[in-house]
Structures are given as structure tokens and as C-alpha cells.
Swiss-Prot record:
Matching InterPro entries: Rbsml_uS13_C (IPR027437), Ribosomal_uS13 (IPR001892), Ribosomal_uS13-like_H2TH (IPR010979), Ribosomal_uS13_bac-type (IPR019980), Ribosomal_uS13_CS (IPR018269)
Subunit (UniProt): Part of the 30S ribosomal subunit. Forms a loose heterodimer with protein S19. Forms two bridges to the 50S subunit in the 70S ribosome.
Residue ranges of the region described as Disordered: 95-122
PROSITE patterns: RIBOSOMAL_S13_1, RIBOSOMAL_S13_2
Keyword rRNA-binding set for record: yes
Pfam families per UniProt: Ribosomal_S13
Keywords for this protein: Ribonucleoprotein, Ribosomal protein, RNA-binding, rRNA-binding, tRNA-binding
Gene this protein is translated from: rpsM
Gene Ontology terms for molecular function: rRNA binding; structural constituent of ribosome; tRNA binding
SUPFAM superfamilies on file: S13-like H2TH domain
Protein name per Swiss-Prot or TrEMBL: Small ribosomal subunit protein uS13
The organism's taxonomic lineage, starting at the top: Bacteria, Pseudomonadati, Campylobacterota, Epsilonproteobacteria, Campylobacterales
Length: 122
């Protein structure tokens, strides 16, 4: 099992799909990395030599932001929006949808479980 960017990649998968298990790498970026490292997409993870794995690690480390660094950057970007007091920042702070969705009936994922209002018993 190859370990790249702190993630164990599944052995039986093709390397182009195996790399997508790393946070911040999708199929397009995976193919870019493999092209830069000169590795075939058809190769399976367990078929990688140590040199090829090192080439992938080097490419990711030098040219891509992944895993913890990317999570930290996203969190910092959201915090900056909140500190600015922008509309998007306020929506993040209140735990409501940020991208203009209606909230009268839906948005349960973002708002959480329903809070019943006005159903008091005598």
C-alpha cells in the first residue's frame, strides 16, 4: 500500500483513481500529476516502484496544496469572510446556506434538526 501525502492509497485501484483519495486531488489534477511524473494512468497502485512513488510525492509537494494545508487554507478563507463582515461571512456565522438558496422550507443540512415553535401544551 503506497503512502502519499499522509494517505494510504488502495492497492487494487488504478493510480489515477487512487490519487483521488487525497483531499484536494480530483481526477483532473491526478492526471496532471501523473503526466508531470511520467507515469501511465493504467498502472495499479501496488505496481508502483519506489522511484515512481517518490516522483509523485515530489510533484505533489512542489506544485499542489493538499490535505491539512488545504483544509487550513479553506478554514482561513472562511474566517476572513466572517471577519470582514461580508454577506457570505454572516451566512457562515449563522450556519445558513451561503450561495443564495431559499431557506423558508428547506436547507435542513445547513440548519440542522427542526426546532418546533409554537406547539406549547396547556
Amino acid at each position: 500500500m503506497a503512502r502519499i501525502a499522509g494517505v494510504d492509497l488502495p492497492n487494487k485501484k488504478r493510480i489515477e483513481y487512487g490519487l483521488t483519495y487525497i483531499y484536494g486531488i480530483g481526477l483532473y489534477k491526478s492526471r496532471q500529476i501523473l503526466d508531470a511524473a511520467g507515469i501511465s494512468y493504467d498502472k495499479r497502485v501496488f505496481e508502483l516502484s519506489e522511484d515512481e512513488a517518490a516522483a509523485i510525492r515530489k510533484e505533489i509537494q512542489e506544485h499542489h496544496i493538499v490535505e491539512g494545508d488545504l483544509r487550513k487554507q479553506v478554514a482561513m478563507d472562511i474566517k476572513a469572510l466572517m471577519d470582514l463582515g461580508s454577506y457570505r461571512g454572516l451566512r457562515h456565522r449563522k450556519g445558513l446556506p451561503v450561495r443564495g438558496q431559499k431557506t423558508k422550507t428547506n436547507a435542513r443540512t445547513r440548519k440542522g434538526r427542526r426546532k418546533t415553535v409554537g406547539a406549547a401544551t396547556k
